[in-house]
Amino acid sequence: MCIRDSCNHSLAHKKDRKHFVVHKCVNTKCPYYLHNLNKVDKKDLKEDYGKNKYKLHYIYREFQIDFFRMDLNTLPKNASSLKFSKHDQHVMSLCLTYKVNLGLSLRKTAQALKDIHGICISHQQVANYCKTASVCIKPFVDNYDYKTGNVFTADETYIKIRGIKTYIWFIMDAAKRSVIGYQVSDNRGVGPCILAMRMAFQHLKELPKNFKFIADGYSAYPLAAQQFFHEFGDKFKFEITQVIGLTNDNEVSKEFRPYKQMIERLNRTYKASYRKTNGFDNIDGANYDLALWVAYYNFLRPHKPVSYTHLR
């Protein structure tokens, strides 16, 4: 039985967030509040607003969207077909090699095909080929069983779409270095974090023993973990190990800093390929570009930890 169950005070509507509404019990005689208050350091109680450093009252988040029912396999719109009218599959493979593997821009890819292979092709046709390839390969990449270990690490970074910040979420298996969850979103809320976690956990019936999920101090990760426990119960009950800041100020940061640096290096690797695009025109373009990059990173790119071979 939850301590809160013995309090009959109704919850007060406090805040409206993008994906949920925050309700709070403001009863100062609530057993949940008194239980937490007893655990507060006595020094903080003597300070003005000292107890405000802690979240003592019962808080309930009422989600307006069910992120556990949303389709993970969204595909880019308006992709061209694999029926070639002017070129063939060989030209398409050359476009993908220069654009994805070598990280060239669309225009430089078109220029490379003309200068090296004598093939005249527009940069828009290169983009169409990339979008078509993404439609074909994204379901495979998203649903592949990577046989994950018991340590996941996550982080988010941002890109620009028409000059506006858009966020990329990555979840990596620390043992195999594979990207097992990713998401493009126009916000930094808990919703896209849940979707990325769903992709990472989709082949697990329950969490492995000694499971660790390592992230930074951003609040979306603990909130997403709470929702997994609420949705699936004890089989997906886990705590977020938060590595905060740039220096090892505590034992947790000292022990788990290498995992945080691992996901930060992944961010830098992706940003290096993204930088040549000079941003995207729409979120569909960001989606297909990211899907192709994850496919390249997981299946084609040589990696130092595995003797410069690919991960799979």
Model regions and ranges:
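Conserved small/polar residues in nucleotide/adenosyl-binding loops
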Residues: M1-D5, T309-H310
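Short cysteine-rich clusters marking metal-coordination/redox-active sites
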Residues: R4-C7, C25-N27
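Cysteine-rich micro-motifs
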Residues: K18-L34
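Short, positively charged, Gly/Tyr-enriched micro-motifs
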Residues: K29-V151, E156-R162
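Active-site proximal helix-loop segment of RNase H-like, two-metal nucleases, encompassing DDE(D)
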Residues: E251-E255, Y259-N282, L300
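C-terminal domain-tail junction helix/linker
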Residues: K276-R312
